[in-house]
Amino acid sequence: MKKTLIIIPSRMQSSRLPGKPLLDMEGVPMVIRVAIKAKESNVGDVIIACCDKEVYEVAKSYNIDVVNTSADHVSGSDRIYEALTKIDPLKKIETIINLQGDMPTISSNSINNLVNLKHSISSDIFTLANEIKDENEKIDPNVVKVAMSIKNDNRYGKAL
């Protein structure tokens, strides 16, 4: 069986919050906290894909695998693709999880549930989503929203 890889795209020049990956979250940088949660899931290797020396060095200091990528990417998906071509040139990895580096509260169970869903449903793309309960988040343009419907016990959604 081919393996699963979790890649966390990261860059210090976030337009909304520069320096976000290294923000202190109870003594641990945010991107590292996310990587630790990913490792706790035990679904596969965890790698941070970054273009910043600071993030690279911090990841190494926490014994998190890290890959240098170009600073010119327009999206995290582009950064992940570059990292993947460096990590897996023979294309042996079957499942790639794009885990956002600004999700320090994600549970390892959520990651496991996503992988389990992939094994039980025939689809190529899966996205984790939660119900928005905070009224301010519902109108915040910086919060990604998903419109969902349920059909035959499957959930179908579209990011808004």
Residue ranges and their predicted role:
Residues 43, 91-93, 120-124:
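Short, high-confidence coil segments that cap the C-terminus of an alpha-helix
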Residues 53-116:
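Short phosphate-binding loop-to-helix
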Residues 9, 98-100, 128-131:
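Short beta-strand segments
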Residues 2-50:
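N-terminal glycine-rich phosphate-binding loop and ensuing alpha1 helix
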